[in-house]
Amino acid sequence: MLRTVGARVRDMPRRRAVLLGVIGSVLLALCSHSVGATRNRGGVLQELGWSNLGFGHLYGIVVVFMWVAILLMILSWIVVGGRIVRLGEALGARTLIAWVAPLFFAGPLMSRDIYSYLMQGTLARDGFNAYDVGASANPGRMFFEVSGDWRNTTTPYGPLHLWIGEGITRITGDNITAGIIVYKILSLASFAVLAWAVAGLARQLGSSPHLAVWIGVANPLAVIHFIGGMHNEVTMMALVCAGLLLGLRAAPVRGLVYGSALIGAGVALKATALFALPFLVWVFVARRAGTLPGEDAPRRRLREILRDLRQFTPARLVTMLIGGLGSAAVMLASVVVITWASGQTWGWVAEISGNTKVINPLSLASLLAGFLVRPLSLVNEEIYFNEIVAVLRPVTMALMLLGLVVCWLIWRRGPRDAMVGATAAYAVTCVLNAVVLPWYYMAPLALFGVWVRDRRAVIVVAWLSMVMSMTFDGGGNNRLYSLWWLIVVGVVMWWTATTCLRDSADGHRLGTTHDLPGEVPVESVDRTPRQ
């Protein structure tokens, strides 16, 4: 029976698969106004007189419809992805638009962060320093929509974030609905730029742009959290990926300058954009001083790493120093200009560490603390979860910094290698950072598809994306502590991923349909162009 069902899912006509995604997206948009991150005062249901859909038995029924909607979106995505991976079909702009467009009409989903964004914008607009005071310093209509945990918390974001929020709230005033609509437009525009940049990176590196956009941008995790949740990571990654694309496409020096400036703008939005800058330097080094011998591949043996370290020629060393200092200077200049133009202070630097209130097992420190608290409390009743986390977080943060350096040292042979390294670096932050949320994974996911060649890796990443899409409910509460939920979702999603993506006929590689001619010009020291 499973084989019959699997064959029907795998061979589903593309038009039907896309239609299921559209139905799921429309249904999710409708459900968001009942079971999403709804407003405490006002909102669509109150305006329509349907407030009874926001509580009681009807609320429970809408929750079921919300999960059905997400499952339809996941099924549509994986079936279309199977046709891209196995048959080399194109993703197509119309398919992407069909999946995303209905969510323009959705309310905030899976997080209340958008209300904090608007509140922080009003702080900047009304002359408050959001790095010194929280939402409670400027009470008003928006204050009541901010999550209680964050009403006295300063913002961890950069001056560009506050500048955007200030501009939006100057236009919309204290109208929450209008502010959300403008943020939704910004999210959609950033999403489009991200898709364009990821497709361009894939072409430059000889990969399939359709696979890259499908796995890195169009996946349900991104669509739900970037468009439904309107998180500023979508704008940050649009700037980062556009910067990396310019670093590959423009002449080496200009590419480094333009790319560093855009990544600097990303840093002014959220500091984690900085992790991509060292790998832009490796792109510059490879294009100016030549690539190192060997295959640009994610897996690297220890002896290969040691051999690469010994092959640090004077030309590469000089190019690296010039490129590193130059990129850092341009990036810093970009941040300085944005900080000055926005009228913000440098207080955001002290807030980079962000908050530590969020506890979930996506962060290794929180996961280990959850396992250790019971046995340790048997030894000493005075040992609590918070004490264990306080000890583990500095350790994992130190390991994260070490991991970032290791990624930079290992993946440096050429442009594709640099993208592998950037992906690995962002993945390290998603595991070892003190606080991790599902949309943080969109940074490594956005870059993953531009270099991947192994079908097994695509299956695993697709599976993780689908599972992660099912871990947060509409209001932002997580299901990561519901073991039965994770087991059932994990098993079903693994069966779905392997059914749609696996093709035993051609082994583990993605096939010739994904091997495109690379377009990255690599110049040696004597300016001899090579590929």
Language model: regions and residue ranges:
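Transmembrane-helix motifs of polytopic, lipid-linked glycan transferases
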Residues: 72-81, 181-205, 238, 402-407
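Start-transfer (signal-anchor) and selected internal transmembrane alpha helices
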Residues: 1-27, 47-105, 414, 419, ...
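Aromatic/glycine/proline-enriched transmembrane-helix motif characteristic
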Residues: 354-432, 507-515
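Aromatic-enriched
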Residues: 452-531
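Membrane-interface helix-loop-helix junctions at transmembrane boundaries of multi-pass membrane enzymes
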Residues: 203-209, 298-321, 405-422, 454-458, ...
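Intramembrane catalytic core of multi-pass membrane enzymes that act on lipidic substrates
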Residues: 86-189
